[in-house]
From Swiss-Prot:
Keywords: DNA-binding, Homeobox, Nucleus, Transcription, Transcription regulation. Interacts (via the POU domain) with POU2AF1 and POU2AF2 in a DNA-dependent manner; this interaction recruits POU2AF2 to chromatin and increases POU2F3 transactivation activity. It comes from Homo sapiens (Human). This is POU domain, class 2, transcription factor 3. Transcription factor that binds to the octamer motif (5'-ATTTGCAT-3') and regulates cell type-specific differentiation pathways. Involved in the regulation of keratinocytes differentiation. The POU2F3-POU2AF2/POU2AF3 complex drives the expression of tuft-cell-specific genes, a rare chemosensory cells that coordinate immune and neural functions within mucosal epithelial tissues.
């Protein structure tokens, strides 16, 4: 009795209330009969104390239960020593698994509520929790699981296997949506490569961008402009339109290379003529018969610039088109201007410089009067009729336009200089036959 009461104050583990009661009942049978009433009284006290200690130990971690069996002695706690150790061995990895995720507080509360009836009923309820733990931890990402595995090295290998398998399969759905985007850059590279190849092969075959559009319209029924083909080669179209246009261009290119002599592929419009290159069709040169040309010459002499009604009448008489007659009169007037240009245009009187010789040779030579020796003081020089107030300079020679007068220019200049030095007087001479 003394030993049981002294050990009661040091018990800190939780056990089944029924097992402890049975153990004490076996001890009470060994004692003498006269002490039975004392044992019953102590049994009630210990039962109440054990129930209080059970609630206190449940509030702490189960790891404190390992202190209890060390204080037990003898065969009295043999029944309590076997089952709590097995329970602790099974609860130790479970407690670490429960504490790993932060959102499983409800699970820990469920564990505490299940441990109150007894330790034997606790073990079968907690056995399925490793499977539930693996199911609850599947949504977590791989890095989170790795950090938890390093933070809790006490986890057994069997509990880490479902987490590692889940971490391997988790990144797969994240990359699935980007698989479509990974194909798009490859398609863009293929389109860029095809556009460059298409341009080179098209130029090699001798087709223009407009030829490709017209040929595709005749062959496949889809007309494309030159701008569309140009934008495709420059990658200026949208991705969707380029994907639609690529198979058609590829088909046309293969047909053009396989059968370049095919008239359906190399149509006449594929090779533009000279008129199409310059943008307008050149008209054929009009040839007019000789008798009609003579008639038109007579009408031109009568009226160089006929009206529209007169041109219509001439065209009807000569059985010609009105536009042809009009153009002929226009060309004839231009020809007349080129022929009679010096006669038709009046000549303004030029202002001569004293040191220059007139270059015009059509006006005829100037008549230069002789310089007499009996008149030493006179100086004869020519001046323009419109420049009467301005005499010529003393050093100027006789102005002439003929080659003979220009050759004698130096001699006349010497004579005029000597006469100027002797007399110093000036005379102006206007030639009556000098016409401008």
């Amino acid at each position: 009795m003394v030993n049981l009461e002294s050990m009661h104050t040091d018990i800190k583990m939780s056990g089944d209330v029924a097992d402890s009661t049975d153990a004490r009942s076996t001890l009470s049978q060994v004692e003498p009969g006269n002490d039975r009433n004392g044992l019953d009284f102590n049994r009630q006290i210990k039962t109440e104390d054990l129930s209080d200690s059970l609630q206190q130990t449940l509030s702490h971690r189960p790891c404190h239960l390992s202190q209890g069996p060390a204080m037990m002695s003898g065969n009295q706690m043999s029944g309590l020593n076997a089952s709590p150790c097995q329970d602790m061995a099974s609860l130790h990895p479970l407690q670490q698994l429960v504490l790993v995720p932060g959102h499983l507080q409800s699970v820990s509360q469920f564990l505490l509520s299940q441990t109150q009836p007894g330790q034997q009923g606790l073990q079968p309820n907690l056995l399925p929790f490793p499977q539930q733990q693996s199911g609850l931890l599947l949504p977590q990402t791989g890095p989170g699981l790795a950090s938890q595995a390093f933070g809790h090295p006490g986890l057994p290998g069997s509990s880490l296997e479902p987490h590692l398998e889940a971490s391997q399969h988790l990144p797969v759905p994240k990359h699935l949506p980007s698989s479509g985007g990974a194909d798009e850059p490859s398609d863009l590279e293929e389109l860029e490569k095809f556009a460059k190849t298409f341009k080179q092969r098209r130029i090699k075959l001798g087709f223009t961008q407009g030829d490709v559009g017209l040929a595709m319209g005749k062959l496949y029924g889809n007309d494309f402009s030159q701008t569309t083909i140009s934008r495709f080669e420059a990658l200026n179209l949208s991705f969707k339109n380029m994907c639609k246009l690529k198979p058609l261009l590829e088909k046309w290119l293969n047909d053009a290379e396989s059968s370049p002599s095919d008239p359906s592929v190399s149509t006449p419009s594929s090779y533009p003529s000279l008129s199409e290159v310059f943008g307008r069709k050149r008209k054929k040169r009009t040839s007019i018969e000789t008798n009609i040309r003579l008639t038109l010459e007579k009408r031109f002499q009568d009226n160089p610039k006929p009206s529209s009604e007169e041109i219509s009448m001439i065209a009807e008489q000569l059985s010609m088109e009105k536009e042809v007659v009009r153009v002929w009169f226009c060309n004839r007037r231009q020809k007349e201007k080129r022929i009679n240009c010096p006669v038709a245009t009046p000549i303004k009187p030029p202002v001569y410089n004293s040191r220059l010789v007139s270059p015009s040779g059509s006006l005829g030579p100037l008549s230069v009067p002789p310089v007499h020796s009996t008149m030493p003081g006179t100086v004869t020089s020519s001046c323009s009729p419109g420049n009467n107030s301005r005499p010529s300079s003393p050093g100027s020679g006789l102005h002439a336009s003929s080659p003979t007068a220009s050759q004698n220019n130096s001699k006349a200049a010497v004579n005029s200089a000597s006469s100027f030095n002797s007399s110093g007087s000036w005379y102006r001479w206007n030639h009556s036959t000098y016409l401008h």
